[in-house]
């Protein structure tokens, strides 16, 4: 373990996958002491040997001030601020494990995008259940690909929290990376919802391209997908303006148009005729949109929100519908006002 652990720790990042690693690298790039925690001790030991995450971010060396650990108690106790970057289906479990080690002044931000499996709850509700209502919470969301962030390419994102001081501190800490710009946003609900819905629409955009449709179809899916995001957001109490920003339109365009997106690549495979299981195997990493689709469609039904694109994607993923048939049914819908 790096001796910098004896110095002040700016932040602890919980989750040593591609995105968690890239965020830790970005935070530590200009000298800030950052802990990157992972649950797999062997994986963390290999990262320490390589001083890089060769599996997910090959060729990107870790800054000296990046500290690796598989010791959850040490990682949580070392820093006031925790940044959780784990898949949505284990988000609550990780926070439950974190709770016994929290400091009196601990604050938790997450960059996880999605909803709680089975319940469809926003992650804020999951976090409160796991650690209590007294711990300050924040969400970081927006258009970010791990490889570009780790390479130091310019990136912009947004952060939201009911705690204004926490937002200001997060902006200050993340801005230290010089190429990572962070906007503040007061819409805590919309900031959480956007990342889940865009995953679903990105699968649809990939399916469209996999079938062989062109840019016209992809753009129509993005535009009408944004409308679905706004309608569901309104039903849950979010602000429409949020979905015109980083956590909505920004993230949606990014993941629908670039093959760095796992959700888009998953959709491409489905559009090319592969089964759901084979498409997931081909990706080789968590495809958040697969689970998100089920939860987003359940929310749409619960709140009576019309989301035809999400419905068709749900039918492809969970009811065995062919991607071409889904596209045909979308195009055959009754004419309506935009």
From Swiss-Prot:
Pathway(s): Membrane lipid metabolism; glycerophospholipid metabolism
Q: Where in the cell is it found?
A: Cytoplasm
> Which InterPro entries is this protein grouped with?
6-PGluconate_DH-like_C_sf, 6PGD_dom2, G3P_DH_NAD-dep, G3P_DH_NAD-dep_C, G3P_DH_NAD-dep_N, NAD(P)-bd_dom_sf
Q: From the UniProt record, list the reaction(s) this protein catalyses.
A: sn-glycerol 3-phosphate + NAD(+) = dihydroxyacetone phosphate + NADH + H(+); sn-glycerol 3-phosphate + NADP(+) = dihydroxyacetone phosphate + NADPH + H(+)
Which residues are named in the active-site annotation? 198 (proton acceptor)
Q: Which residues bind sn-glycerol 3-phosphate?
A: 113, 142, 144, 198, 251, 261-263
Q: What is this protein called?
A: Glycerol-3-phosphate dehydrogenase [NAD(P)+]
A GO molecular-function descriptor: glycerol-3-phosphate dehydrogenase [NAD(P)+] activity
For this protein, the parts annotated as crossing the membrane are none
EC number, UniProt record: 1.1.1.94
Q: Look up keyword NAD and say if it applies.
A: yes
What is the residue range of the signal peptide feature? none
- The main location is cytoplasm
Coiled-coil intervals in this record?
A: none
Q: Where does NADPH bind?
A: 18-19, 39, 113, 146, 262, 286, 288
Q: Which family does it belong to?
A: Belongs to the NAD-dependent glycerol-3-phosphate dehydrogenase family.
Keywords of this entry? Cytoplasm, Lipid biosynthesis, Lipid metabolism, NAD, NADP, Nucleotide-binding, Oxidoreductase, Phospholipid biosynthesis, Phospholipid metabolism
Q: Which organism is it from?
A: Photobacterium profundum (strain SS9)
What would be one Gene Ontology cellular-component term for the protein?
cytosol
Protein purpose: Catalyzes the reduction of the glycolytic intermediate dihydroxyacetone phosphate (DHAP) to sn-glycerol 3-phosphate (G3P), the key precursor for phospholipid synthesis.
Entry's Gene Ontology BP terms: carbohydrate metabolic process; glycerol-3-phosphate biosynthetic process; glycerol-3-phosphate catabolic process; glycerophospholipid biosynthetic process
**A Pfam family reported for this protein in Swiss-Prot or TrEMBL:** NAD_Gly3P_dh_N
């Amino acid at each position: 373990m790096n001796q910098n652990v004896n110095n002040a720790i700016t932040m602890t990042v919980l989750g040593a996958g591609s995105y968690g690693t890239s965020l830790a690298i970005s935070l530590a790039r200009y000298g800030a002491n950052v802990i990157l925690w992972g649950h797999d001790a062997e994986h963390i030991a290999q990262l320490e040997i390589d001083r890089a995450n060769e599996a997910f971010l090959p060729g990107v060396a870790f800054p000296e001030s990046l500290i690796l650990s598989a010791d959850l108690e040490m990682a949580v106790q070392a820093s006031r601020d925790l940044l959780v970057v784990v898949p949505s289906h284990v988000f609550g479990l990780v926070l439950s494990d974190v709770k016994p080690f929290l400091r009196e002044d601990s604050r938790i931000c997450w960059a996880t995008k999605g909803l709680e499996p089975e319940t469809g709850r926003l992650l804020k509700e999951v976090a409160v259940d796991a650690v209590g209502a007294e711990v300050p919470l924040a969400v970081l969301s927006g258009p970010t690909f791990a490889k570009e962030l780790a390479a130091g390419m310019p990136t912009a994102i947004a952060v939201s929290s009911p705690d204004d001081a926490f937002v200001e501190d997060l902006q200050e800490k993340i801005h230290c990376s010089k190429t990572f710009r962070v906007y503040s946003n007061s819409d805590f609900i919309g900031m959480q919802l956007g990342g889940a819905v865009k995953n679903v629409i990105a699968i649809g955009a990939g399916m469209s391209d996999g079938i062989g449709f062109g840019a016209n179809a992809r753009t129509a899916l993005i535009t009408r997908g944004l409308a679905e995001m706004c309608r569901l957001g309104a039903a849950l109490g979010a602000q429409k303006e949020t979905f015109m920003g980083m956590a909505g339109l920004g993230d949606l365009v990014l993941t629908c148009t670039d093959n760095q997106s796992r959700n888009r690549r998953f959709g491409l495979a489905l559009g090319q005729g592969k089964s759901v299981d084979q498409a997931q195997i081909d990706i080789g990493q968590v495809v958040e949109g697969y689970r998100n689709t089920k939860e987003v469609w359940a929310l749409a039904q619960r709140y009576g929100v019309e989301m035809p694109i999400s419905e068709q994607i749900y039918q492809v993923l969970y009811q065995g519908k062919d991607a071409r048939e889904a596209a045909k049914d979308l195009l055959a819908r009754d004419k309506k006002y935009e």
